[in-house]
Amino acid sequence: MSGFALFINRPVATSLLALAITLVGLLGLRLLPVAPLPQVDFPVIMVSASLPGASAETMAASVAMPLERALGRIAGVNEMTSSSSLGTTRIILQFNLDRNIDGAARDVQAALNAAQSLLPSGMPSRPSYRKANPSDAPIAILTLTSAQYSQGDLYDLASTRLAQKIAQINGVGDVSVSGSSLPAVRIDLNPDALFNQGTSLDTVRQAIASANVRRPLGAVADDGRRWQVQSNDALMTAQEYRPLIIRYRDGAPLRLQDVARISDGVEDVRNAGMSNGQPAILIMIRRSADANIIETVDRLRSDLPALQALLPGGVSLDIAQDRTPTIRASLREVEQSLAIAIALVILVVFLFLRSARATLIPAVTVPVSLIGTCAAIYLCGFSLNNLSLMALTIASGFVVDDAIVVLENIARHIEDGLSPHRAALAGVREVGFTVFSISLSLAAVFIPLLFMGGIPGRLFHEFAITLSASIAISLLIALTLTPMMCARLLRPRHTDGGMRPTALRRLSALLQRGYALSLNWTLDHARWVLLTLLAVIGLNIWLYISIPKTFFPQQDTGRLMGFIQADQSISFQAMRGKLQDFMHIVRADPDVDNVTGFTGGTRVNSGMMFIALKPLGERKQDAQQVIARLRTRLSHEPGANLFLMAVQDIRAGGRQGNASYQYTLLSDDLAVLRHWEPQVRKALAALPQLTDVSTDQQDKGTEMLLTYDRPAMARLGIKVSEVNTLLSNAFGQRQISTLYQPLNQYHVVMEVDPRYAQDERALDKMFIINQAGQPIPLSGFASWLPANAPLSVNHQGLSAAATISFNLPPGGSLSDASDAIAHAMTALGTPPSLRGTFAGTALLFQQAQSSQLLLILAAIATVYIVLGILYESYIHPLTILSTLPSAGVGALLALMLFNAPFSLIALIGIMLLIGLVKKNAILLVDFALTAEREQHLSARDAIYQACLLRFRPILMTTLAALFGALPLAFSYGDGAELRQPLGITIVGGLLVSQILTLYTTPVVYLYMEKLRARFSRQKALPPLAY
């Protein structure tokens, strides 16, 4: 008894095998996590260091460079960028995809420890790190609002009570709080009153620090009791500081309230946050690199009542924005496409076989194969995401192929007079090797994908494993369950309750007769057909060169990020007004649902906005159209620019640019970089292939440059360090004392009252008390002039860097933009000391584009090797592969027709076509070789008979695969921009391939047979058989 007979004769065992596959698949489906895409995030660690009051250039030289030299030695770092601004340095380390984030964090900590001795001694704390990418869009934004509490109090609640609890949620990588700063006692000094009293700013500082000292005072005890000694040595509120005596003058006390305004405020008054136009504290939550967005947000939502319980009455905690609704909607759309695809595939089978009994067989085998695949997805540690669901949708079109080939062949034997049982045995034996060849060669396409690295490799890997698993399960079902069901369900036509001859059946017969006549003509004019095939190959090359290319389709996630960039000399008050104006304009758009934003911190000329659009079904336009509309309205706002970009699921690089793509200029000479960056930016801004061109080069800030008269200072008894201390006390929002509270530590902040520090004339009011006790005005030993100074200094690697960000205009492609940038750089004639390189997603595109052709050739070579092994022939694998050029032309023409650029998703479609379209040739070649060997027919008669005999199954399998891809090609709704390129590629490729290969494959077969006969007198060994 053969293996096929075993399954046909034991229906219970075969049915239970299928049931077991289904149950295991359902269990896997239930346990599968849900995500927008496969896990493709680079491990990223952010290092932060601070030195209050230090300029951007000082931070870059004394803090960033020592840290970069130490961190650059860590294994697996593929990109290191840093940004230094007033008092802070931030270094972003991006690691290789295969680097474990926890191991990388240990290496980072070791490098920070090694670099500690090289850092300035005045740093208030050691550098710290976080395992999160600051350039990622938050997965959720919480807002804290209240009519009873101040912004400082709300910030305190958020940072003290909420941030730590949220950070403990599994999957959360970083929690940042914006919109204000911690509460503080603020001392705003009156320089005129101090001068009149002959009291220096440092005297005030020392008096405050001495009055607020908390030290352990010990305990007293007798034989039976013990008392802890405590005192009121700490001053905690503004009210307690006001009567503080600074000094005595002529026997009279000088109190703090006599020379300063004391209030309960915040540490940094130059921060503002808003939500929908109202003041709010923003809690931005980013996930860790390996976390699942949906699971993380679900945990956050479940913990929300407990978080609200930590807050006092009158404080509202709300989720202002959440990225998961559009992700869930996108997955629902793919699930609907999958259901439609399965229904269409089964309809194709019904229309061709015209039998409800026959249609029931693929109606069972297709779901079993697809459900069983879910178990494989779970065992491999993957998720249920857009790509894996698209893979299942496409699989619905070709897992039915195996069942169709077996079913159609068995049905043909029944029509020829065999009993269903004998027809099942004969039919499955006859096509078993063919089905095996189709499945194995289809799976072979994905072998090169498993060796790809980077983000494309991660995407392809999961897609390839999913499809390979579906192919393997489909093959098993086709050779076991399908023949068993055929033996039990199929009946001869005269006893079957199937449909009688219909117009469709007559049309099918007419098509077959027409094909027979046209095939004869084609074989008589084989040379012209061969020339046509060569022309198709040339057309492939031209189309691939001509088609616009991009890395990944622009997604509409329903979320936009806005970056406000104002004049580098703008004040905080003016910047806050710009933020309010921009938020008002954006909120007025009919497609916008929610807007949050903040400004302040070390870069007072910038701000950030997070915009949630209405659900796709409730708005009239997609994200890119909304951006274009807002860009027009926002262009009339003077003094600042708002750059908008749609949040994407795939983003690389740690630098937070103003747009989706980056081009970085590098130089070891900062002067060269600063000279050429404006010229390069101007040239790129003039390119029509780019839009929203901006730069992170902030070197036009205004400063007052002081020049000390050192001989005069020596004569007056004044030290440079004393002058620097004076200026820090006056203008640096200096934290001069610490307030220790049960839940947090706060500070006393001292500076000159902002009313006396609005312009450069504030320096005229500064004075210092020399060693002789005389008040000496600053102008007595120093002069100053306005000058330009960098607000930030950026590095990449160990070189000075300036990153130019850009978006693409509507209909633009990344390949056109890349070519235009390359030509512009060549035309500028930049010096060798200035290097230009793409960064982030644009760099990934460059890397992926260089390997695309190699990947396609590797897949073709793998298929050739597998087919050569199966058929023991060097020649006929070429016959089978001759079907590929027509599929490529169809796919590329379809993409161009629908104005879709060639992306990674389209490349996945091309790889699928390599596996799909060759099955037609396999069916023909396999039957032709068998007819030559067993019936001793000539090559022409054998291929002619094979074409007519396999016309119906070829038509059925191609239409099944085509109809399986149609729901993707014509999909709409959330996530359609991901599904459409895949569906368009497959539908276009299958259509053109189906038309051409029915004629080119027989011609190529004849030429290959002539070639084989010429070079070998011996007949090729027969292929492997069961």
From Swiss-Prot:
The keyword Transmembrane applies. Keywords: Cell inner membrane, Cell membrane, Membrane, Transmembrane, Transmembrane helix, Transport. It is a multi-pass membrane protein. GO terms for molecular function: xenobiotic transmembrane transporter activity. The chain crosses the membrane at residues 16-36, 333-353, 360-380, 387-407, 435-455, 459-479, 528-548, 853-873, 897-917, 953-973, 984-1004. It comes from the Bacteria. GO terms for cellular component: plasma membrane. HAMAP family: MdtC (MF_01424). PANTHER family: MULTIDRUG RESISTANCE PROTEIN MDTC, PTHR32063. Belongs to the resistance-nodulation-cell division (RND) (TC 2.A.6) family. MdtC subfamily. This is Multidrug resistance protein MdtC. It comes from Edwardsiella ictaluri (strain 93-146).
